[in-house]
Amino acid sequence: MAVSFRGLSLSAHSEGLSEVDKNSGEPENTYILRPIFQQRFRPSVVKDCIHTVLKEELASAEYSPDEMPQLTKRLSEMIKDKLKELGYDRYKMVVQVVIGEQRGEGVFMAARCFWDADTDNYTHDVFMNDSLFCVVAAFGCFYY
């Protein structure tokens, strides 16, 4: 006899024992409601990671309107991958990259979030050279 409930299948053997086979595609629920202190989103560490990526990738970059969409996508993916390497397993990372041309004009940016102030956080970094400016915001939201 076998019964299946949303990714779990229970099988009864002839001895009356049952085993649980979990669907390998779904993450295991650990019932952790808060991250331990060492695994909390640390804005200073994340900001250093962002700054390192921007410095390496944009130090000699020139603004070109045709190339900027691909560059913003590549930067956001690189930063997101670096943040995953830091061990934020239970966090959903959102990385926003804005690149603009240096023309002597001003730019105002804002973000609002509805989240748990105890577990979720964000940081941002700004990079500028003679040709362009880049603003990166990284948001970490804890999975319950």
Curated annotation (Swiss-Prot):
Against CDD domains, the record matches this protein to: DLC-like_TCTEX1D2
Query: Which GO CC terms are listed, alphabetically?
Result: axoneme; centrosome; ciliary base; cytoplasmic dynein complex; dynein axonemal particle; interphase microtubule organizing center; spindle pole
Keywords per UniProt: Cytoplasm
Q: What is the lineage of its organism?
A: Eukaryota, Metazoa, Chordata, Craniata, Vertebrata
Locations listed in the record: Dynein axonemal particle
Mention one GO molecular function: dynein intermediate chain binding
Q: Could you mention a single GO BP entry for this protein?
A: regulation of intraciliary retrograde transport
Gene3D superfamilies per UniProt: Tctex-1
What job does the chain carry out?
Acts as one of several non-catalytic accessory components of the cytoplasmic dynein 2 complex (dynein-2 complex), a motor protein complex that drives the movement of cargos along microtubules within cilia and flagella in concert with the intraflagellar transport (IFT) system. Required for proper retrograde ciliary transport.
Report which superkingdom the organism of origin falls in. Answer: Eukaryota
UniProt-recorded name of the protein? Dynein light chain Tctex-type protein 2B
Question: Where is this protein chiefly located?
Answer: other
Q: One short Pfam family name for this protein?
A: Tctex-1
